[in-house]
Every structure is written in structure tokens, then in C-alpha cells.
């Protein structure tokens, strides 16, 4: 007859094997997974430029999504009916735009803000130049 191992021994082996699996997964997660910077560095130049160009747009979309989630969570409607995001399973909502932020409008407003900043900076520089010109208009024959 074979000696039957106690029940606690079998369960200890199960927990040990599970712990080894989880530990291996965590170890792989921290050693193999690239950081965001490493991943971006591996992008091709075109993809990297597109990523940098649309970074603020994605952040704006994320903010808008958080706002929608807050609105939806405060509503008493079911989650699939609340909020402005259309469900792909509803016939009348299938063709709705899933964009949270209008990309053209976002880029246009960003460009306008940059232009306003450049104009303000140019105005400040011209005022500074006028002030310096007023200081230098003192006649040379007066000593005091």
C-alpha cells in the first residue's frame, strides 16, 4: 500500500505552486515589460512625431471621458443608456461619432492660443523697446 500524504501537505503544494506562478508573473512584469520611454524610443520617426503631436489631444479626450463617467455615475439611468457615448449594440446609435473631442477644433484652438502668445510676446517686446528708446532720448549736452 502506498502511503497517503496528509491533506495539508497536498494543499501546501498547491499554494506553493500558485505562489511560484504568481511570483514568476510579477518578476516578468518588472523585468521584461518596457517602460513608456523605452517604448516611445522604439517608435519610427513618423509614429513618434504623430505621438508627440497628438499627445495633448489624447489627454483632452481622457479628461472628457472622465467627465462623462462622473456624469454617468451620478445619473440614475442604466449605464448603457446614460451618457453621450452611443452604444454599438443599439441600432439608432451605431453610426454616431465616437470621438470625445473634435480633433480639428482642438488643433485650431491650440494654434490660435500659440498665435495669441506670440502676439503678446511681440507686443511686450515692442513696449520694452519703446521704453528703452524713451530713456535714450535724453540730450547729450545735459549732464543731470
From Swiss-Prot:
The gene is CBP4. It is a single-pass membrane protein. The chain crosses the membrane at residues 10-32. It comes from Candida albicans (strain SC5314 / ATCC MYA-2876) (Yeast). GO terms for cellular component: mitochondrial inner membrane; mitochondrial membrane. Disulfide bonds: none annotated. It is found in: Mitochondrion inner membrane. Residues 109-144 are annotated as: Disordered. Essential for the assembly of ubiquinol-cytochrome c reductase. It has a direct effect on the correct occurrence of the Rieske protein, core 4, core 5 and apocytochrome b. Keywords: Chaperone, Coiled coil, Membrane, Mitochondrion, Mitochondrion inner membrane, Transmembrane, Transmembrane helix. PANTHER family: ASSEMBLY FACTOR CBP4. This is Assembly factor CBP4.
